[in-house]
Curated annotation (Swiss-Prot):
Chain ranges passing through the membrane: 3-23, 41-61, 65-85, 106-128, 141-161, 168-188
Recorded family membership: Belongs to the MntP (TC 9.B.29) family.
Record's function text: Probably functions as a manganese efflux pump.
Protein name: Putative manganese efflux pump MntP
The keyword Cell membrane is annotated on this UniProt entry: yes
Primary localization class, coarse: membrane
Annotated Gene Ontology cellular component terms: plasma membrane
Compartmental location: Cell inner membrane
Keyword Cell wall biogenesis/degradation assigned: no
Gene that specifies this protein: mntP
Keywords attached to this entry: Cell inner membrane, Cell membrane, Ion transport, Manganese, Membrane, Transmembrane, Transmembrane helix, Transport
Any Pfam family matching the protein: Mntp
Length: 189
């Protein structure tokens, strides 16, 4: 995977966490930088671990699917991208509102895990392409930490405007990364 695709992948993986962080930030009266950084670190670490787990699962299966691995990566990324676009187009979910300032570690960790399931699937797909998984996981974690920290700080102002659009943009980027992987493999053959 080329460096530009890796950067796009990292930021695409962070968009759903960014949208969640905007929601978290909007529930705080005045988000403090320390709270935003804490939230960003929790999300970033979890988002970096999940593609590693997915990659390990993909590696275990890679010997059985080596001839069509690029198609698996492509299909997974396109399906995840379409899912993110669909979620971005849907009406807001009815969610249980937290009280301001009630962002415990466990609430943040569960939210981070929920938004990182797509990174697990991407990790499975990355097992079938030429990529340094530790570099990819680190990039995904760093991008997520950055985007979540910003999303938490900007949540109050941007919550109503950006949340759904960020998820849709992330979905489009995932589809483009999947198409790039497929193109690179087919053009090399």
């Amino acid at each position: 995977m080329n460096p530009v695709s890796l950067i796009f992948l990292a930021f695409a993986m962070s968009t759903d966490a960014f949208a969640a962080a905007i929601g978290k930030g909007s529930s705080l009266d005045r988000p403090r930088l320390s709270e935003a950084l804490r939230t960003g670190i929790i999300f970033g670490v979890i988002e970096a671990i999940t593609p590693l787990v997915g990659w390990l699962l993909g590696q275990a299966a890679s010997q059985f699917v080596a001839d069509w691995d690029h198609w698996i990566a492509f299909v997974l990324l396109v399906l995840l991208g379409l899912h993110m676009i669909h979620n971005g187009l849907r009406a807001d979910h009815e969610t249980e509102q937290e009280k301001p300032g009630q962002h415990s570690f466990w609430i943040l960790a569960v939210t981070a895990l929920a938004t990182s399931i797509d990174a697990l699937a991407v990790g499975v797909g990355l097992a079938f392409v030429d990529v340094n998984i530790f570099l990819a996981a680190g990039a995904i974690g760093l991008a997520t930490m950055t985007m979540v920290t910003l999303g938490t700080m900007l949540g109050r102002a941007l919550g109503a405007v950006t949340g759904k659009r960020a998820e849709m943009v992330g979905g489009v980027v995932l589809i483009l990364v999947g198409a790039t992987i497929l193109y690179e493999h087919l053009s090399a053959a």
